């Protein structure tokens, strides 16, 4: 009687474990498929801010060149080009423009296709086309030896811009070595290298960039931990580079740091 009861219990346990394994496998596959088809939704977070109705850039021209939109302020024949992160819009970054205006650079704040109420879905291919259009605009208008600034996701288009040439300085804030590395560190159970289409590989893009490179990163950054920018920094052969870790600041508040402000201003004060 007892052995029969034990056999029934073992049968129930085996059935439970089998069902649990099947459910786990189905869940794994389901989330895998969801990530494949919706990965852009996990990377890009645009808002519906209207590009033309931005109060923060009232004193800038609103330009559109080959479907690439940007805010532009004419200054010297050296330009500073700003590429923002993955959330919100360029309009949100108007608070930081004062850092760049003291040196009378011509200033460009780039808006990505798919952002600021644009109906296109953001994607790497189109964002790189935005970069190419900005690069052509700079060349056409004789804006040379420029400063390129990219923050977070913006380090990808900024690095691509640097790879196209005519960049005297590159400033990267909270960057990663590659999007592939970043996502692998967050989603360890999936073969990201197989399924990721939106890989911004800054390590490769900057392999031949040898001009000035400044990397700033908050020591308390949880979204893109500082070891990602350290890997980028250490993996580049460029000898004209600097990596500054700003302790006690994270991903979204780094720009409030006095060290951040001083580092940016000092960098811009050095003539190209």
Please name every model-derived segment.
Residues 89, 220-224, 251-252:
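Acidic catalytic loop of the alpha/beta-hydrolase fold
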Residues 155-211, 258:
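Hydrolase active-site cap/lid region
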Residues 209, 215-221:
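Short beta-strand/loop motif that positions the catalytic acidic residue
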Residues 142-152:
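Alpha/beta-hydrolase fold nucleophile elbow
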Residues 231, 238-272:
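C-terminal catalytic histidine-bearing segment of alpha/beta-hydrolase fold enzymes
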Residues 69-137, 151, 155-156, 160:
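Membrane-embedded segments
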Residues 96, 202, 211, 225-234:
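Short alpha-helix in the alpha/beta-hydrolase fold that links the catalytic acid
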Residues 16, 20-66:
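An N-terminal hydrophobic leader/cap segment in hydrolases
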């Amino acid at each position: 009687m007892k052995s029969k009861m034990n056999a029934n219990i073992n049968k129930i346990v085996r059935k439970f474990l089998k069902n649990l394994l099947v459910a786990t496998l189905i869940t794994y596959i389901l989330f895998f498929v969801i990530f494949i088809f919706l990965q852009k939704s996990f990377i890009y977070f645009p808002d519906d801010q209207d590009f033309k109705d931005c109060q923060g850039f009232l004193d800038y021209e609103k330009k559109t060149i080959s479907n690439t939109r940007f805010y532009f302020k004419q200054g010297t024949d050296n330009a500073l080009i700003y590429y923002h992160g993955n959330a919100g819009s360029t309009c949100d970054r108007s608070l930081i423009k004062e850092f760049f205006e003291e040196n009378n650079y011509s200033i460009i704040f780039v808006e990505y296709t798919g952002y600021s109420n644009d109906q296109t879905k953001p994607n790497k291919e189109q964002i790189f086309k935005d970069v190419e259009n900005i690069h052509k605009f700079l060349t056409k208008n004789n804006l040379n030896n420029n400063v390129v600034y990219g923050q977070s996701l913006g380090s990808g288009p900024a690095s691509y811009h640097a790879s196209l040439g005519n960049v005297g300085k590159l400033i990267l804030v909270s960057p990663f070595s590659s999007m592939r590395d970043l996502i692998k560190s967050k989603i360890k159970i999936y073969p990201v290298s197989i399924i990721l289409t939106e890989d911004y590989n800054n390590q490769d893009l900057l392999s031949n960039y040898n001009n000035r490179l400044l990397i700033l990163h908050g020591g308390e950054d949880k979204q893109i931990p500082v070891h990602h920018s350290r890997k980028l920094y250490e993996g580049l052969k460029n000898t004209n580079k600097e990596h500054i870790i700003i302790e006690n600041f994270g991903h979204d508040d780094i720009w409030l740091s006095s060290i951040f402000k001083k580092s940016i201003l000092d960098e811009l004060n050095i003539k190209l």
